[in-house]
Amino acid sequence: MERFKKASSIIETLKQQGHEAYFVGGSVRDLIIDRPIGDIDIATSALPEEVMAIFPRHVPVGLEHGTVIVVENGEPYEVTTFRTESEYEDFRRPSSVQFVRSLEEDLKRRDFTMNAIAMTEEGKMVDLFAGQEAIQKREIVTVGNAADRFQEDALRMMRGIRFVSTLGFSLETKTKQAIETYGHLLEHIAIERITVEFEKLLTGTYCVKALKELVETKLFSHLPYLQMSEEKLLKATQYKWDSFEADIEAWAFFLYCIGEEHPAVFLRQWKFSNKKIKDIVAVLLTIRKRKEKDWDTVFLYKTGIHIAEMAERVYEAMIESYDHTAVNRVQTLFQALPIKNRQEMNVTGNDLLNWASKKPGPWVAEMIQKIEEAIVQGNVVNEKECIREWLQECNLL
């Protein structure tokens, strides 16, 4: 409760001004579950302009949705006016938002009962939709009619399965049936938003359970490049997914599991950044080489420790070896390298030009590369004079 105590002065101030105010959302859910608390959100009957008038230190981030960030005790908190939402457009966005003075009306519009629990500053729960019961049963249940909730916002179906992965809960029967029925609506949702949820699914503690739900609900068939992947997704559930330390590793392993032959095309379709695509593809290419040969100094140096560590963890998952001794060996081997990158070389192109008395040209870059490999392989010490002598001995000057 310590983190809530820091924010409780906001609720107390709002109440002193004649308004209602409560802690709401994921932070309340996580407190009940005893998970680490993320962002703390507050819902209030005060209108946005009233919130801004009461708290001088504020940022009006989403006034059309009733949200104001209030800075209290050096921490930012989202304070949002109770609201209802009218008809939804594109199965994602409400066409308009109406501010209301009723907590019940505000909680009624939320996705799942576990996320529709409010809490007073004293820690008393206001649970109008049996959210605590769902948490006790470890069930994901929609607020009200599941069909209505998913037709309002189709992304909620992906969120539901993402919560299976992060919390280990199960989809309640009617909620699961509604996902099977309305899964096609997911095709109306921007892929960027789906990618965010899918990444949380892949990196969740209970990823295997979530992948099974993805198959059982047929929701996978409405995702780009996964329409024909039922058997491969089921194969993916036979592996352990808890050894990865980065989302790049999880995506690389997922692409391996589904046998994706053109990973860059897949990732572009899912709207990944170029940097992330480059890293994921680099991990996969490294694994392909790793299958053919063990690590040596040149292979490791050219790969770099960042990609090498990730590739080794994914490779361990592929061969179902989870003791991390191979990762530790890669780290030890890398630390023993004479240089970790080209910037650590004690020779420059200007040095070569001075020594050789030749005109600049492609030969300089070629020579730097030869020296670099010789240093990495231990054939020459990374000192300027040693490098010069080595070049002379090899008749390269």
Curated annotation (Swiss-Prot):
Signal sequence range: none
Catalytic activity entry: a tRNA precursor + 2 CTP + ATP = a tRNA with a 3' CCA end + 3 diphosphate; a tRNA with a 3' CCA end + 2 CTP + ATP = a tRNA with a 3' CCACCA end + 3 diphosphate
GO molecular function, one term: CCA tRNA nucleotidyltransferase activity
Assigned EC number: 2.7.7.72
Keywords of this entry: ATP-binding, Magnesium, Metal-binding, Nucleotide-binding, Nucleotidyltransferase, RNA repair, RNA-binding, Transferase, tRNA processing
Residues given in the record as Mg(2+) binding sites: 39, 41
Essential cofactor(s): Mg(2+)
Record flagged with keyword Transcription: no
Binding of ATP, residues: 26, 29, 110, 153, 156, 159, 162
Biological process according to GO: RNA repair; tRNA 3'-terminal CCA addition
Keyword set includes Ligase: no
Pfam families, sorted: PolyA_pol (PF01743), PolyA_pol_RNAbd (PF12627), tRNA_NucTran2_2 (PF13735)
Residues annotated as binding CTP: 26, 29, 110, 153, 156, 159, 162
Top-level EC class: transferase
Function in brief: Catalyzes the addition and repair of the essential 3'-terminal CCA sequence in tRNAs without using a nucleic acid template. Adds these three nucleotides in the order of C, C, and A to the tRNA nucleotide-73, using CTP and ATP as substrates and producing inorganic pyrophosphate. tRNA 3'-terminal CCA addition is required both for tRNA processing and repair. Also involved in tRNA surveillance by mediating tandem CCA addition to generate a CCACCA at the 3' terminus of unstable tRNAs. While stable tRNAs receive only 3'-terminal CCA, unstable tRNAs are marked with CCACCA and rapidly degraded.
Quaternary structure (record): Homodimer.
Note: A single active site specifically recognizes both ATP and CTP and is responsible for their addition.
PANTHER family associated with the record: CCA TRNA NUCLEOTIDYLTRANSFERASE 1, MITOCHONDRIAL
UniProt similarity note: Belongs to the tRNA nucleotidyltransferase/poly(A) polymerase family. Bacterial CCA-adding enzyme type 3 subfamily.
Protein name per the record: CCA-adding enzyme
Biological source species: Bacillus cereus (strain AH187)
